[in-house]
């Protein structure tokens, strides 16, 4: 993705891979369709709550699964079974933001699962989540800038083509 962006901008800059931006591990839900994920999460949650599989209705599994996905999309609450180290993601964003020299512009490319933790650099994550959809859409762009030692988000999840109109 970074190569493509740099080519389109006709810019020749080095690309540095940073493991802090690597996509999260969705565990058993990796590469699965959303319907399957929703049912699996709902079933797993209900079984954990003591219900037996024979007593689980598909509607109830879907209802709970949708609720768990909504928590992920609205508050970054990691569903059961996903291999996500939230503290590592948060500290990675804080370390990365602190490492960017004043006056430099960086293009960071990552997935929505990782990007949803980037607002921690703002210092007001809960407020940000209350006013933004933290699920970054496919192809979405998030723009941050730093003034002094204070980061701000000027654009969140906008489609790239809208930047070039």
Language model: regions and residue ranges:
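Acidic, low-complexity terminal tails and accessory targeting/binding regions
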Residues: 7, 11, 24-35, 99-105, ...
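Phosphate-coordination/substrate-recognition cap region in phosphate-metabolizing enzymes
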Residues: 1-59
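Short glycine/proline- and acidic residue-enriched helix-loop micro-motifs
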Residues: 42-84
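A mid-sequence, solvent-exposed acidic-amphipathic segment
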Residues: 75-101
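Beta-strand elements within well-structured catalytic alpha/beta cores of enzymes
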Residues: 17, 101-110, 114
């Amino acid at each position: 993705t970074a190569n493509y962006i740099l080519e389109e901008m006709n810019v020749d800059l080095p690309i540095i891979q940073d493991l802090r931006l690597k996509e999260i591990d969705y565990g058993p839900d990796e590469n699965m369709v959303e319907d399957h994920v929703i049912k699996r999460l709902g079933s797993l949650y209900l079984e954990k709550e003591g219900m037996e599989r024979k007593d689980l209705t598909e509607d109830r599994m879907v209802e709970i699964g949708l609720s768990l996905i909504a928590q992920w999309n609205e508050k970054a609450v990691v569903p059961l079974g996903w291999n996500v180290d939230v503290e590592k993601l948060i500290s990675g964003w804080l370390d990365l933001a602190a490492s960017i020299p004043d006056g430099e512009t960086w293009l960071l490319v990552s997935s929505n699962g990782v990007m949803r933790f980037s607002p921690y650099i703002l210092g007001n994550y809960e407020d940000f989540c209350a006013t933004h959809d933290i699920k970054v859409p496919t192809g979405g762009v998030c723009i941050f800038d730093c003034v002094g030692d204070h980061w701000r988000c000027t654009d969140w999840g906008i489609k790239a083509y809208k930047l070039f109109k």
